[in-house]
Amino acid sequence: MINGSIVALITPMNSDGSVDFASLERLVEFHIDQGTDAIVAVGTTGESATLPMSEHVTVVSQTVKFAAGRVPVIGGNGANATSEAVELTKSLSKVGVAAMLGVTPYYNKPTPKGLIAHYKAVAASTDIPQILYNVPGRTAVDMLPETVAELVSVSNIIGVKEATGDLSRVKRLRELCGDDFLLYSGDDATAREFLLLGGNGVISVANNIVPQAFKAMCDAALAGNAELALSIDTPLRGLYSTLFCEANPIPVKWAAHRMGLIECGHIRLPLTELSEQCHGLLIEAMTRAQIEVK
């Protein structure tokens, strides 16, 4: 079972836009050293939308290589064309990922029937465990708990990342999907409550820059220690909101660069680097979270 503190890893890039694999290796080592429980490679935070498929597979493959079995790597396999998602899934099945994370098809707004057919087709193309991913704020489609429940019977669909921030869904998903179905928060601001309500883990943006504290918060919440989880979480709360002052992963990449975790904060168009008016806000939030800014 993959649970606990899972980082939605950024994809570091050089100033010319190419992937910076040296920085990627350092990031993987950093997270292993800090106790991160698993790594998601090339999800939303990893700029999946602007990496061509061949490059996408290479980044996931290299992440697996750098992790060297010390921490599970989950590969992003979402696409808005089912045929493309199937092709990507088949390629990722060959590189050693522990699981895959598939966002709902975006822009074309499938019905529940379409979502079910999409995920069944993707799951049928591999034996690797599949995690569904619902983030309607980015995809324009909301996969309701009732739709998720229709997919529980697919043997290699093992869980869902729920990123709406609607905590009522934790109880509803658990009721409909059973105790063995894995529930992951995709919203840092409500992650602590999500875990205390019975979630299994958090796939986090903030974890990129505060992995040790975030891991401690997750461990406390999973152990049912609400008071300790709150005390760890409180200094991080400003960070959770400020990391979304512009579209993810713009702020977190800038922050990682300021910390010296990556050599360059470059991000691919149509996203651009963090606006100057956000710099002070993010530095203030990082300082409150006891992050050293270089």
From Swiss-Prot:
Annotated InterPro entries: Aldolase_TIM, DapA, DapA-like, Schiff_base-form_aldolases_AS, Schiff_base-form_aldolases_CS
Location in or out of the cell: Cytoplasm
GO CC terms in record: cytosol
Matches recorded under CDD domains: DHDPS
Residues carrying the site annotation Part of a proton relay during catalysis: 44, 107
PROSITE patterns: DHDPS_1, DHDPS_2
Pfam families associated with the record: DHDPS (PF00701)
Keyword annotations from UniProtKB, A to Z: Amino-acid biosynthesis, Cytoplasm, Diaminopimelate biosynthesis, Lyase, Lysine biosynthesis, Schiff base
Free-text function comment from the UniProt entry: Catalyzes the condensation of (S)-aspartate-beta-semialdehyde [(S)-ASA] and pyruvate to 4-hydroxy-tetrahydrodipicolinate (HTPA).
Protein name: 4-hydroxy-tetrahydrodipicolinate synthase
Gene giving rise to this polypeptide: dapA
